[in-house]
Amino acid sequence: MADGKERPIHENHRARMQERVAHNGMESLAEHEVLEYMLYLAIPRHFGSFCRVMEATPQELMQVKGVGPRSAQLISDIMEFGRYYAVKKRKKQATLDTTANAIEYIKPLFLGLQNEVLYIILMDDSCHPLYDLKAAEGVPNHVSIDTRKLLRDVLRSNASTAILAHNHPTGPALPSATDQLTTLKIMQLLAPAGISILDHIIVAGENACSMADRGRLPDISAHPGILNAASTDF
C-alpha cells in the first residue's frame, strides 16, 4: 500500500519539474533538482556539489542509496559526452601558432578528468593540428609511457611539429621538475624523427600555463642524448 501511494506523489513532482524546465529552462531548478530531474535520484548531498557528482566514478556513485549500476554509468557518461562535445566543437581549421590558440584548443581534452593524461598534439609545419594523440594515462601525478608505441603512432601522422599537453588533477597549473624531465625525454625521442616540440601546456581545472612562455621548455641541444628504453615512467 505504501508503494502504491508514493508513486503518484513522485510522478506529480516529476511532472511539475518537467513543466518548469519546459517553460523556464534548466536555470529555474536548484542544483540538487538538476540531478533529480535528470535521473529522479536523491539530491547530491553525498558528494557536496553537482560538479563532484559529475566527476565521480560509477563505483563511487553506487555508494549512494538508490543509485544502481545503470544510473551510475549514465551519470558518468554524461561527463564523457560533455568532453566529447567540447572537443568536437573546436575550430576545425585552428592554427596553434600562439599560446592562447593552443590553450583554447587543448583545454577541452581534460574536461572533468580525475586522472593524469598526457596528449601530444601532432601538427604540420604551419601549426595546423593533425591528430590529438593520447600518449599515456595514469593515476594523479604519475603516468607510464610505452615509448616504442608512442614513436610508431607519431610516425604514422606525418607530423613535423607537436605540442605536449597534460593535466594536473590535484595540483596547480605550474610545471614541475618532473614535467620538465618528461618534456626533455619526449623531445629526445621525437627529434630523430624530425618532429619539434614547440611547447608543453599544463592544465589544471580552468587554468593553464605554457612552459615555453615561462622559459621552462628544455633546450634539447644542451641534452642531445637519445631515449632508448622501451617504456618509461613519468
Predicted segment positions?
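Charged, compositionally biased N-terminal leader segments and the immediate start
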Residues: 1-41
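Divalent-metal-activated hydrolytic enzyme cores
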Residues: 184-234
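Charged helix-capping and loop-helix junction motifs
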Residues: 146-148, 177-184
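Histidine-centered catalytic micro-motifs
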Residues: 161-172, 196, 202-203
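Long, charged amphipathic helices and adjacent flexible linkers at domain junctions
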Residues: 86-102
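Histidine/lysine/aspartate-rich catalytic loop segments that bind and position anionic ligands
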Residues: 103-157, 161
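Amphipathic, charged-and-aliphatic alpha-helical interface segments
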Residues: 31-55, 72-88
